[in-house]
Amino acid sequence: KKQGATALSFDTISASGIRSAMPHGIATDKKIENGDFLTLDFGCVFEGYCSDMTRTVVVGKANDKQKEIYNTVLKAQTTAIDAIKAGMKCSEVDGVARKIITDAGYGENFGHSLGHSVGIEIHENPSFSPKNNAVVQNGNVLRLNREFI
């Protein structure tokens, strides 16, 4: 609010442990424990436009498997961001990230879409999924998830 936000874009999500990988996971009575993945998903409305940001961290020290998962997801996200260009099908953008996740052995855990546009509404078109053949346009405001396995 101090910087001009007028509202939250959506209810903030905080999920730990197994629930940290669930799209739109909700908090339970489970206590956050050392070694848990913790996913925070939040956003605000500023000058009439929505934002949406997600971060996943490990509480305490990450083990080797957690580092592998984190780095795989990060690589998928950054590679897809680098690949996006006007004229590209949304399904192609999704495919860039999905291939990295699948090649790392986590494809069956990638049930959520890669991302979506944001604007006046928190979820706008185009969205990034294997079935969406909409084309990325100059001027789209895009959000690629990092919490998708």
Residue ranges with predicted function:
Residues 1-149:
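Active-site neighborhoods and metal-handling regions in enzymes and metal-associated proteins
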